[in-house]
């Protein structure tokens, strides 16, 4: 199923941090919910982080535009609309 394919994506960042990003493909009510599970520092002290991004569907976002402290431009997300 396609939702299983999209539900768990792992990014390897240029700073050699490995994070798992879950639940990021749906833009609902102009918000994109991103749950980030940290494997290594600098996010190790917060193993689970929830972020909400403004979005318009369909589209994409670079997380580094919002949180440059933790991510770089490799952390790019493409998302789709929630079916209503």
UniProtKB/Swiss-Prot annotation:
One of its GO terms (cellular component) is extracellular region. Its main location: secreted. Keywords: Disulfide bond, Ion channel impairing toxin, Neurotoxin, Potassium channel impairing toxin, Secreted, Signal, Toxin, Voltage-gated potassium channel impairing toxin. Residues 1-16 form the signal peptide. It is found in: Secreted. Expressed by the venom gland. GO terms for molecular function: potassium channel regulator activity; toxin activity. The keyword Oxidoreductase does not apply. Contains 2 disulfide bonds. The keyword Signal applies. Inhibits voltage-gated potassium channel currents in DRG neurons. 200 nM of the toxin inhibits current amplitude by only 25% and even at concentrations up to 5 uM, the toxin does not inhibit all potassium currents. In vivo, insects injected with this toxin showed signs of neurotoxicity including twitching, paralysis, and body contraction. Belongs to the scoloptoxin-11 family. This is Kappa-scoloptoxin(11)-Ssm3a. It comes from Scolopendra mutilans. The lineage of its organism: Eukaryota, Metazoa, Ecdysozoa, Arthropoda, Myriapoda.
């Amino acid at each position: 199923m396609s939702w299983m394919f999209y539900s768990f994506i792992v990014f390897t960042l240029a700073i050699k941090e490995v994070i798992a990003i879950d639940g990021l493909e749906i833009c609902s009510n102009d918000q994109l919910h991103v749950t980030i599970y940290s494997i290594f520092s600098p996010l190790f002290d917060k193993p689970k982080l929830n972020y909400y991004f403004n979005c318009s569907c369909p589209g994409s976002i670079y997380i580094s535009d919002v949180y440059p402290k933790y991510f770089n431009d490799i952390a790019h997300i493409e998302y789709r609309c929630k079916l209503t």
